[in-house]
Amino acid sequence: MKGTFPVNKFRELETPFYYYDVNVLRETLSCINKEAGKYNNFCVHYAVKANANHKVLTIIRESGLGADCVSGGEIRAAIKAGFPTNKIVYAGVGKTDWEINLGLDYDIFCFNVESVPELEIINELAAAKGKTARVAFRINPNVGAHTHANITTGLAENKFGISMEDMDKVIDMTGTLPHVKFVGLHFHIGSQILDMGDFVALCNRVNELQEKLYARQIIVEHINVGGGLGIDYAHPNRQAIPNFTEYFATYHKHLKLRPQQTLHFELGRAVVGQCGSLISKVIYVKQGTNKQFAILDAGMTDLIRPALYQAYHKIENITSEEPMETYDVVGPICESSDVFGKAIDLNKAHRGDLFALRSAGAYGEIMASAYNCRALPKGYTSEELV
């Protein structure tokens, strides 16, 4: 089963480009609000790193979600899209002074602190402004997620966060730093997680830490468990919206919050992944010695995930209904890794056919590069192409 696309409109546009189905996006956001809304103390932030397209950000902001940012540029993009600054959280292992100052100037909700030196610098910069920064400590829980090695973030060997062993020392430090206020704990174990058992393991580790803090008569304002919920790359038409019911229910069941504590989430891929497709044109169909190649005008510069993570994206020939043939689908970049899929069965391809690379709404347009001096792909919403 293929997706439904405004092919006639596509033919008027220069390829490659990203296409965002805002109906899918809005249905996804509605489901998030419905399921998270079952629990009074759940707050959801959108992980801007997944897709910072201004039109996409604006729709997400209109839904009421907050913003999870990992750079000063993302903070600016969120503010430009209208996100309230008191719903912006800021994480990242390498926050620079200007980025910290930007967050301080806008009085963002919280800095998720990842090291002792960072905590000291935030205190110093806040003091210079006569402000007190709200901080949560990103704790590395040493929980392994069942996902690609390059997108696990919660193991002791990863660069992210403060070790559980150092948590007490860092908390004690806040008592000596008058311009930071310790308000929360932050976690994030990885991305594209489909096994709810990984989130249960995180809940158990958070519960352990909460008990340790409670023994010291410390109860933080909020717990932030990050995001990580994956999407169904194999069946974007059958399962466009992730199972948010099970996701939020898992945390409600297994995480032991204290009275008045709020639970924060940072969802990215699960919000935008299925609403986006990369649309590309077939330049040539080339017969090799043992295989056929469908050579597209899109390459790894436009969608790097297959080359970087060996990620699968469903590929559809959206302008052909001819019998199936088998192709290696490749791009024009001067790299052997510029391959979107090998031995893919597709409707017979001809020069000028349009291919859709599905489930590309997350970590697609945002990760595009100008390698080979190529132009960056544009992004269009379904509302623009009516």
Language model features: what each stretch is:
Residues 1-133, 172, 176-181, 211-218, ...:
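A charged N-terminal "starter" segment
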Residues 3-4, 250, 260-386:
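Charged (often Lys/Glu-rich) extended helix/loop segments that serve as interaction or gating elements
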Residues 45, 134, 222, 262, ...:
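Hydrophobic "anchor" residues on beta-strands that sit immediately upstream
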